């Protein structure tokens, strides 16, 4: 579907070969269920499972999503839309400031003053054979107004579904949702002025439709479940056994998820951009703000 660097309008096909797999790392756990993994649910649902890393429950599944997201990002760039992902919390280390532009560190962390603390944390986790979770964020700049449907395909609902599809994600918040319980209605409402919105607690989406402000969301990824710390589980015969998962596993899978989240958000936005163009091309979708 690509010729001389341009799409042809035909389906685009891609194959990503995994040439660095080490399936033997999983041979000692092929008959036991890893705690907090999909092993037990896949086995119950299908009566069979791929124990070599979890099959489609593995984050390897997301490699093709990121590839497709690269195409979506190119479409959004032509529209002036940018999608920016970052990590704001890892374990008990929280960013004091959020800078989602020009992040250039191996943790995708938004506060570079915390990098030495993160290095110490990761060294300790590796030595201990343990893991921690993370909070990630995505900010979409210059999103046009009007994307999303009012009921069954709300933009925030589709974004939530896309993010929750990512492995190990356990919750998502749109806008300032985590703090809304502490605010009164007079504080939480995003008042409208002639120059724009006075705040963005809604995260750029109202009634399932983008309102022209930045779209912001955050989500939490659980600690890596495959760890070297010994734990309890059952084997295929239903007997209680100890488990210790060897192999190459991250102390925090959250740092791997930034490009995945950017890709998923980009794919949802492109879908809605094209749908909105088809449905509302004859409507002048303007906000009543002063230029």
Protein language model features and the residues they cover:
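Glycine-rich, mobile lid/loop segments that gate access to catalytic sites or pores
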Residues: 45-151
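Glycine-rich, N-terminal phosphate-binding loop and its surrounding beta-alpha-beta segment
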Residues: 1-41
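Short acidic, glycine/tyrosine-flanked loop/strand segments centered on an H-E-D-like triad
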Residues: 30-56, 231-251
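Internal helix-turn-beta structural module
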Residues: 226-291
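Glycine-rich anion/phosphate-binding loop at the beta-strand->alpha-helix junction
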Residues: 129-240
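A short glycine/serine-rich beta->alpha loop
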Residues: 1-3, 49-61, 145-149, 202-206, ...
């Amino acid at each position: 579907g690509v010729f001389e660097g341009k799409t042809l309008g035909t389906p685009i096909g891609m194959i990503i070969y995994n040439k660095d797999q080490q399936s033997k790392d999983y041979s000692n756990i092929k008959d036991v269920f890893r705690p907090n993994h999909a092993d037990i649910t896949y086995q119950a649902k299908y009566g069979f499972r791929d124990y070599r890393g979890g099959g489609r429950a593995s984050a390897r599944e997301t490699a093709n999503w990121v590839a497709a997201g690269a195409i979506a990002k190119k479409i959004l760039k032509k529209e002036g839309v940018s999608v920016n992902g970052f990590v704001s919390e890892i374990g008990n280390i929280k960013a004091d400031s959020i800078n989602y532009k020009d992040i250039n560190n191996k943790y995708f962390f938004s506060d570079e003053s915390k990098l030495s603390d993160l290095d110490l944390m990761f060294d300790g986790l590796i030595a201990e054979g343990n893991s921690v979770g993370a909070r990630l964020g995505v900010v979409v700049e210059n999103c046009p107004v009007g994307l999303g449907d009012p009921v069954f395909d709300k933009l925030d609902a589709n974004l939530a579904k896309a993010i929750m599809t990512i492995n190990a994600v356990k919750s998502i918040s749109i806008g300032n949702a985590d703090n809304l319980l502490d605010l009164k209605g007079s504080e939480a409402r995003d008042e409208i002025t002639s120059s724009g919105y006075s705040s963005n607690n809604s995260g750029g989406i109202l009634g399932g439709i983008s309102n022209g402000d930045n779209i912001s969301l955050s989500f939490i990824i659980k600690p890596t479940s495959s760890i070297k710390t010994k734990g309890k589980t059952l084997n295929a015969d239903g007997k209680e056994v100890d488990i210790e998962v060897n192999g190459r596993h991250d102390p925090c899978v959250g740092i791997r998820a930034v490009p995945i989240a950017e890709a998923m958000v980009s794919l949802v936005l492109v879908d809605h951009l094209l749908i909105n163009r088809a449905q509302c091309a004859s409507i002048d979708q303007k906000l009543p703000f002063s230029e």
